[in-house]
Structure formats: structure tokens, C-alpha cells
Amino acid sequence: MKLTCVVIVAVLLLTACQLITAEDSRGTQKHRTLRSTARRSKSELTTRCRPSGSPCGVTSICCGRCSRGKCT
């Protein structure tokens, strides 16, 4: 019974701390790079393959073929 009360009080305390912290940080953003995906242009989002002459590898897809690390 005692342990249950301690757990309930701890959960309530942590919840209150989170709510207070969330209210204080409203309107401020420390890590602006997290939302950098919203700034991408439409051409960047629709381009799925790399043009010839670009470097290629596992993470990049060529419009043609990947030969010796370059798109052809």
C-alpha cells in the first residue's frame, strides 16, 4: 500500500513538472534543424534520382545506372 502511494505521488510530480516545462518553452525552439524538412522546395521532394555525373552509392539512386561510383 505504501509503495503504491509513493508511485502515484511520483507519477503526479513528474506529470506536473512536464506540464510546467512545456508551458515555459512555448514559442521557443532550440533545435531549428529539426524542422528543416519543411523548407525543402517542391523540386527537391519530387526528384527521386540523381542525374548522370553525380556520385552514387547505396543511399542515392541514379536516373540511369551507377557505375564506379558515378551515375551514367
From Swiss-Prot:
The keyword Secreted applies. GO terms for cellular component: extracellular region; host cell presynaptic membrane. Expressed by the venom duct. InterPro entries: Conotoxin (IPR004214), Conotoxin_omega-typ_CS (IPR012321). Its main location: secreted. Keywords: Calcium channel impairing toxin, Disulfide bond, Ion channel impairing toxin, Knottin, Neurotoxin, Presynaptic neurotoxin, Secreted, Signal, Toxin, Voltage-gated calcium channel impairing toxin. It is found in: Secreted. It holds the Pfam family Conotoxin. Residues 1-22 form the signal peptide. Residues 23-48 form a propeptide. Disulfide bonds join 49-63, 56-66, 62-71. GO terms for molecular function: calcium channel regulator activity; ion channel inhibitor activity; toxin activity. The presence of a 'disulfide through disulfide knot' structurally defines this protein as a knottin. The cysteine framework is VI/VII (C-C-CC-C-C). Belongs to the conotoxin O1 superfamily. Omega-conotoxins act at presynaptic membranes, they bind and block voltage-gated calcium channels (Cav). This is Omega-conotoxin-like 15. It comes from Conus striatus.
